[in-house]
A protein has these predicted regions:
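Acidic, metal-coordinating catalytic segment for phosphate/diphosphate chemistry
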Residues: 90-193
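DNA-contacting surface of Y-family translesion DNA polymerases
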Residues: 1-115, 188
């Protein structure tokens, strides 16, 4: 918008100045990566989704967030891409649940006509007032145990580095899995436009 740019250039911005302590609401947490080689099967995809989901869920736990919507991004070798999303059973920040849901969404939506070049994963629709409903199937208790395990793994990674502990899935191809979106995560400034 040319008029807006001209106003900014002249210093005519009339929006109120925000206080330095005011933070923006977080709307999503995600990571994406271009892989070092093309992905050719579901096992390759699971390795990448495992690394991405562990990073995303770790960042959500650090912020005390649980998300209810999962999105995946897939780009193939010829740079055709798509995004798909699904609602999760309940708000979660458990990496295993995110991996399982991402793989289920991927398997339903990709037919392997072409190798994959890039994958992404994000969680949105955060439940800030999370409370769980009473459940006879004990899924809430299972989720709490998994959250405690993930939190213990986070503490180990914080203390000894990202590669001190991990899921066995990522050991099938260390060339694919040897990246750390959690450590390499960059937050880019938001444009006023």
């Amino acid at each position: 918008n040319g008029i807006l740019l001209r106003q900014y250039a002249r210093g005519e911005d009339k929006t109120p100045v925000r206080h330095k302590d005011i933070e923006r609401d977080i709307k999503s947490i995600g990571n994406a990566t271009t892989t070092p080689r093309d992905l050719v099967n579901n096992n390759d995809v699971k390795i990448i989704f495992t690394v991405l989901a562990e990073s995303v869920s770790r960042r959500m736990r650090n912020l005390g967030l649980k998300g209810t919507t999962l999105s995946i991004y897939v780009r193939d070798k010829k740079l055709g891409s798509f995004v798909r999303q699904c609602k999760l059973e309940s708000a979660t920040n458990v990496s295993g649940e995110i991996i399982k849901s991402a793989m289920a969404l991927f398997v339903i939506n990709y037919d392997w006509k072409m190798p994959i070049r890039s994958l992404g994963l994000s969680v949105t629709d955060f439940d800030f007032d999370y409370c769980s409903q009473f459940d006879f199937s004990k899924t809430v208790e299972k989720r709490e145990k998994l959250e405690k395990i993930d939190t213990a793994v986070d503490a180990l990674k914080d203390r000894y580095g990202n590669y001190c502990i991990g899921r066995g899935t990522v050991l099938f191809d260390t060339k694919l899995s040897h990246f750390s979106p959690y450590d390499d995560h960059n937050i880019h400034p938001v444009s006023p436009l």
